[in-house]
Amino acid sequence: MAIKTDTNLSLFSSLDEDIICGVDEAGRGPLAGPVFAAAVILDPMRPIDGLCDSKKLSEVRRDALAIDIKAHALSWSIAQCSEQEIDSLNILQATMLAMRRAVEGLHIQPTLALIDGNRCPVMVVRAEAIIKGDDKVQAISAASILAKTARDHALGLLHIAYPHYAFDQHKGYPTALHLERLREHGVSPVHRKSYAPVRALLDNAVANEKR
């Protein structure tokens, strides 16, 4: 699934100049919920102040910047891979797929995708991986903010559907509280069953049934 919008392309200085999108993900480590990715093409004529790695920003600041990015970027797209896709493909491949979906969801086709990290998804667009790119490239910073805020919103909705797990507090990460609630309430439909703590609970449940 991809969510996208864009403004009109205000044009770069020459037809030969690369149209660059930044790409980043959010949610590889959690035990529950989808993994998200975002792609952003910034408008060089409409700079956005304060872009940096989303992890270094407060929730309030991230949310404010996400609004600015969506309003001022030339094009942006948010995509995800479900828990089922994560369990079927593994988290690395699911993350790569979410990134590719995000890039493909852009209304303006980039000529170069700058990817945060050390791996690039397989896609038609030329791509370059940049380690710690979310701190070095503003378009990647913007993508990290959109991916993070979209995932946090999704986990808020999961908290409404499954309040016993306190997703609003830990966002699905394997905190002591989350593990305690997992042991108490069992595995929900939105947990990643291929992840070790979740798989161990499922294996224990099967073993207990056989006794």
Curated annotation (Swiss-Prot):
<keyword id="KW-0378">Hydrolase</keyword>
<protein>
    <recommendedName>
        <fullName>Ribonuclease HII</fullName>
        <ecNumber>3.1.26.4</ecNumber>
    </recommendedName>
</protein>
<feature type="binding site">
    <location>
        <position position="25"/>
    </location>
    <ligand>
        <name>a divalent metal cation</name>
    </ligand>
</feature>
<feature type="domain" description="RNase H type-2">
    <location>
        <begin position="18"/>
        <end position="207"/>
    </location>
</feature>
<dbReference type="InterPro" id="IPR001352">
    <property type="entry name" value="RNase_HII/HIII"/>
</dbReference>
<comment type="function">
    <text>Endonuclease that specifically degrades the RNA of RNA-DNA hybrids.</text>
</comment>
<dbReference type="GO" id="GO:0006298">
    <property type="term" value="P:mismatch repair"/>
</dbReference>
<keyword id="KW-0963">Cytoplasm</keyword>
<dbReference type="GO" id="GO:0032299">
    <property type="term" value="C:ribonuclease H2 complex"/>
</dbReference>
<feature type="binding site">
    <location>
        <position position="116"/>
    </location>
    <ligand>
        <name>a divalent metal cation</name>
    </ligand>
</feature>
<dbReference type="GO" id="GO:0003723">
    <property type="term" value="F:RNA binding"/>
</dbReference>
<keyword id="KW-0479">Metal-binding</keyword>
<dbReference type="Pfam" id="PF01351">
    <property type="entry name" value="RNase_HII"/>
</dbReference>
<dbReference type="InterPro" id="IPR022898">
    <property type="entry name" value="RNase_HII"/>
</dbReference>
<comment type="similarity">
    <text>Belongs to the RNase HII family.</text>
</comment>
<keyword id="KW-0540">Nuclease</keyword>
<dbReference type="InterPro" id="IPR036397">
    <property type="entry name" value="RNaseH_sf"/>
</dbReference>
<dbReference type="GO" id="GO:0030145">
    <property type="term" value="F:manganese ion binding"/>
</dbReference>
<keyword id="KW-0255">Endonuclease</keyword>
<dbReference type="InterPro" id="IPR012337">
    <property type="entry name" value="RNaseH-like_sf"/>
</dbReference>
<feature type="binding site">
    <location>
        <position position="24"/>
    </location>
    <ligand>
        <name>a divalent metal cation</name>
    </ligand>
</feature>
<dbReference type="GO" id="GO:0043137">
    <property type="term" value="P:DNA replication, removal of RNA primer"/>
</dbReference>
<keyword id="KW-0464">Manganese</keyword>
<dbReference type="GO" id="GO:0005737">
    <property type="term" value="C:cytoplasm"/>
</dbReference>
<dbReference type="GO" id="GO:0004523">
    <property type="term" value="F:RNA-DNA hybrid ribonuclease activity"/>
</dbReference>
<dbReference type="InterPro" id="IPR024567">
    <property type="entry name" value="RNase_HII/HIII_dom"/>
</dbReference>
